[in-house]
Each structure stands twice: as structure tokens, then as C-alpha cells.
Amino acid sequence: CQQWERADKKDHRLYAFALDEGRLYEASYKTLIAHEDKLNPGAFIASLSIPWGESKGDDDLGGYHLVWPRDMVNTATGLLAAGNSETPLRALMFLAAAQKADGGFYQNFWINGDPYWTGIQLDEVSFPVMLAWRLKRAGGLQGFDPYSMTMSAVAYLMLNGPITQQERWEEASGFSPSTLAANIAALTCAASFAAQAGDKVSAELIQDYADYLKCHLEQWTVTTRGELLPGVPEYFVRINPVKNVNAVEGLNAAELFINNRPASKQQIFEARNIVDAGFLELVRYGVYPADSALIRNSLKVVDAVLKVDTPKGPCWRRYNHDGYGQKADGGPFDGTGVGRAWPLLTGERGHYELAAGNDVTAYIKALEHFVSRGGTLPEQVWDTDDIPAAHLYKGGTTGAARPLAWAHAEYIKLLRSAADGRVFDQIPEVVNRYINAPQLCKLIEIWHMQWQTPKVRPNYTLRIIAGESFHLVLSRDAWQNSDDFPSKGTGIGVHYVDIPIGQATPGAQLLFTFHWIERNVWEGKNFTVKIAE
């Protein structure tokens, strides 16, 4: 009895902000607790369900019975919002143990830490860093030191970004607004960690990289030729698919392949005309203000393309032309289907509206109405005309995952945000740097093996970073002459050289190669960065 009472201890203030007498709050809290494995403390799976389980065979072992770092940290943060810091600490410790040697995290894994899918999602590297920061700020670390985990994670971000192999919908690679939002926030948290530890060099390097992402964000993820809403050509896209690290393709001309669509239907679309609401994460963490004209214009497009008004309240689809969901005839998703509306996106929109100073009652009420008969929130709801024979009703559950822990966490965080009068996930250090006292962009371009930026402008600094010490041998005149630059080390294992470009002639080339000091080997090939016009 005492053990259950400890697990059920939560912030009773939040009941006052529920509109259903606290039923969903109570159910959400217990649902999140139930998703922790009992033999592997801190291991939270995404859902106790198997989506469209009635159509699945024994060969589909994973289902949603896996740990996704993104879903898990959202679960832990939902519990933290409810006043529970002990369970989120177990989650952080589990993630620290599951972290890869290179600082990254697997896309998902079994509760014992063994990987299942091995894709790279850079937001999933960022989320554990933000959880560590939140627990530290809340005084909930209880002697556990996440510093090594945090620094390894941000070193991984710096050496493997800014292109993510997969974004939060796990289907596309490129520049993702939601991924970059998480990266910027996590890097800023880590810079704060390093500064507090007295490592000013690492703190500055980490923050410089966060600033670099922020200063390039619109160049990478905003179209100026969108066609989805007349009169609004400029908005954030879902993702800018980049095929070649050596040559960033212009977003306005890029094409995006969309998964889960039948071969008989169009599968390749112009990236500028595919949107989701992932850019709202920029407001959630404090990278952009809620009243940004670009954010507001992007919302106009999202509402015109993705919003669904159901009898139970407003809901949003993930992105246009999504194929992950119940089929049009009501049949189960079997590799193809139609993406339906996701209640967790109603919660995300509620957080934006709160940040904008608006009433969030409609979003709290909608989430409470989206619950199933068993009191749980689904991943998706039916978003078109009723099909009674298939038990599908507009605003009602589908065969998608139910419960979805992430959706329950989003509801709890929305209650907490309403109680506090500010977004619970907002990070003060991020707000201070990018909203309250915005910094001028440094004239810096970053190059590393996974991000071989092709150009640098006159009067900029080209910063070359690597995960080991090196000598950079560089020529500005086609190897008639060369200079040798030893790298500078940092406390996070990232080494770097800064090359001032000065008044270089546009069109000129920088040629360089590496001698790796510890291994005493030459890279064996040259690299080129051109001086931009």
C-alpha cells in the first residue's frame, strides 16, 4: 500500500485546471507509471498496445513495446510536471546506461537496452540532455551526476548534425524544424552545465554551435515559394530533404519522398508544399517568440491544410499526404493507409496558445473528450465521416496505438502549464538567449566530416571540428603554399581549428587535409570550401 501511495504522489493543484473533474489527469498519471518496466527500472515503453494488432502476425515482435528516447523523455517530463521527480530520475539513469559509446542513442530498443531499430534521430540525442537539465533545475538528481552523459551527447550532436537521418516521424532525413529546436535547446542546456562546471572553453564552443543552428534555421527550413495557402508563400516546412552533405539543395526546389503510400499513388512531392506543426517546438523551448510573424504565418498554413474539427474538439494531422493510419474504407493500416489526426498535436497546439497568451480551455477539453471508453488517449482519432460498420466515428479512436504515453504526458504538461501560466517545457536559458536578449549571429561557418559545408563568406570564420586531435594543413593558392594549424582540444572531446577568411576573393578555394595526431596518419585526400559570392 505504501509503495503504491509513493508512486501515486502527484501535484493536486492540477485537478483544478482539468474540466472533467480530474478523471483524465488521474488516468494519465497512472498510465504513465504503468509504462515503466518492473524489472528494468526507468525503462518506459511507448505504448502497452500493438497498433492494429488484429491484423498483425507473430513476426511483428516490436509493436510499441519498445523504448524510444523521445517518447520516454516526454513520459518522464509529464511525470515531472505532475510533481514526481523520483521516477524521471530512474528514466534518466536508464538512458545514461543505454547511451552508445559515441554519445548517441539508438532509435529504439528493448527494455534491456538491446537495439531494435538503429536509425539516427538527433532529437532523441537531445531529449536526455534536456531531462538532465530539468532534473538538475528541480533539485531531483539525488546525487546522480549526468555530466558525462550530457557532454557525450552534445559532442555527438556537434559531430553528426545538423542533418538528421530521421525526424520525429521517423520517415525522412534532412533539416527538420522540430529536430533543430530540440538540438538548440539541448545544446544551450549543455552549455549551462559546462559553464557551471568551470569549463568555459567547452561552454562557449557548445553555445556557438547552438547559435550556428539558430542563425541558419530559416535558411534551411523555411520556404519562400510555398503554394499551400494563397498569400502566404513563406512558412516552415516539415523537412528539407538534403541528399548530399557537400551541396545543400535549395529548399524551394527539393523533392520529398513520403512513406506509407500505395505505389499506385503519388509518393514524391515538392518539399516546400509539405508541412507539419513541428516548428511549434521552437516556441515550446523558447527559441522563437509566440508572436513571431513567421510562426503565425506557418500556423495559418498548418490550420488550412492539417486541422480537423471533430465533434469532440480540434485535432491535427501530422503532415499532408501522410500514409500512416486507418485506410479510407476503415480497414487497418498494413503498410499503407491514410494518416489521421493525432490528439497529442492538440496538446502541442494548446501549449503554443498558452505561450501566445490565449485561453487553452478548448484544448484541454478536446483532449478529455478524445479518451476511449477505457479512459485512455489514442495515438490517432478518426477524422472523416462515420463508418458505423467499422466502429469508426469522427473524433473517436481508430486501430492505432492506445494508450499512447506521449499523448497522456502532453495532457499533464498542458495542465501544469495552465497552472503555472507559462509553458512547462520552456527553458529559461533558451528564452534569455534567443528572445529576451537575442544575440547577433556570429560570422561563423562550421565544417566537419558529416557536414562538409561547401561555402564560406568573406570576413567569416571557418570552424573545422573533429572528434580527435589533428593538424590542419591548408592552402589558399592551390598548394603553392600551405599553413599548418594544430587543433585546440576541449573538455568534451571535440577538437577545432578556426580559419579567419578575411577579404578573400569570391570564387577562390580553400584546400585542406588532415593529419590525425593520435593515430599518426594522414587523411589521404583533400577537401574544398569555396569563398561565396
Residue ranges and their predicted role:
Residues 75, 118-135, 254-256, 269-289, ...:
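C-terminal capping/lid segments that line or modulate ligand- or cofactor-binding pockets
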Residues 426-533:
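Glycan-association/targeting regions that enable binding to alpha-glucans and other polysaccharides
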Residues 51-61, 105-120, 158-175, 256-264, ...:
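Acidic/His metal-coordination segments adjacent to aromatic residues that form catalytic metal sites
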Residues 9, 15-24, 121-122, 178, ...:
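Extended ligand-binding clefts on enzyme/binding-domain cores
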Residues 28-40, 83-106, 145-166, 208-228, ...:
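Long, well-ordered core segments of solenoidal/helical folds
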Residues 13-22, 39-42, 79-92, 134-151, ...:
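Structural helix-adjacent loops and short alpha-helical linkers that scaffold large soluble proteins
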Residues 62-163, 176-180, 184-190, 408, ...:
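Aromatic-rich carbohydrate-recognition surfaces in CAZymes
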Residues 1-63, 426:
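Acidic/polar, glycine-enriched structural segments that form the non-catalytic walls/loops
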